[in-house]
A protein has these predicted regions:
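Catalytic alpha/beta core domains of metabolic enzymes, predominantly
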Residues: 136-142, 148-238
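Active-site beta->alpha loop and helix N-cap motifs at the rims of alpha/beta catalytic domains
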Residues: 2-153
Length: 238
């Protein structure tokens, strides 16, 4: 099972390619799986280290579960173990998230990519308890916290990460969508890989270069080479 130290290189967060008439409400199926698998293969050949499916850009909030199953299965089969595949399982409630996590684990996902349930604004206890419940229910699947404070109506403060490190052992990484500070790294950096992305990786590098082992990029679908080069140079001490 992956740990925080295994999270290295560039995590690509591509869109989920739409079929020619996929936006039509009369269509029962919206995805172009041939393009999804072609894109996954191309990104691997261009140097990405992991692929994360069905984040925001990947239409996590709009695809049907049957469509996600087809997408995950097709991409995991195409990737064939060359890089880890992280599958989005954000949903409206914990029971559904657990069901989806168990399903993607059986498909061969390396980890789940999970945001807080999109319904009521969470308290601190709600937010921590949610990820603690996931660790108890699915103890053999790592979790990346989708920590976007605007989408999930929660600021992901230092206290949250201190409690996550103590109460949610399957959380190994986060897609940072909040102002990262040294204090976040101090309270949870050993368990959780704090991954910044396109707009903030330079800030993290200047603040705590030793903490930068990985980064995320939605723009990787247009060519990941700049981010692959940045992370490679950092790894070489260049």
């Amino acid at each position: 099972m992956l740990t925080a130290s295994d999270v290295t290189g560039l995590l690509a967060l591509p869109p989920s390619p739409l079929a020619a008439r996929g936006e039509e409400l009369t269509e029962e199926y919206s995805l172009d799986l041939d393009e999804a698998t072609r894109l996954a293969d191309q990104m691997i050949r261009d140097g990405v280290s992991a692929i994360g499916l069905c984040g925001t850009t990947g239409e996590c909030a709009t695809l049907l579960w049957d469509e996600k199953v087809a997408l995950y299965s097709a991409v995991i089969d195409t990737v064939a173990g060359r890089v880890p595949v992280w599958c989005g399982t954000t949903a409206l409630g914990t029971r559904e998230v657990v069901r989806e996590m168990r399903a993607v684990k059986d498909m061969g996902a390396a980890a789940a990519f999970v945001g807080l349930p999109l319904w009521q604004t969470p308290t601190m206890d709600n937010a921590v308890g949610f990820f603690a419940d996931l660790a108890e229910a699915v103890p053999d699947l790592p979790v990346m916290v989708y920590a976007n404070r605007f989408f999930f109506k929660f600021d992901f403060p230092v206290e949250f990460w201190a409690r996550i490190a103590a109460e949610a052992p399957t959380v190994i990484a986060t897609k940072v969508g909040f102002p990262l500070t040294q204090e976040h790294l101090d309270v949870a950096g050993k368990q959780v890989n704090f991954m910044t992305g396109e707009g903030t990786i330079g800030l993290q590098y200047r603040m705590a270069p030793e903490s930068v082992t990985a980064a995320w990029a939605t723009s990787a679908a247009m060519g990941p080479e700049p981010w692959v080069a940045f992370l490679g140079a950092h790894a070489r001490g260049d």
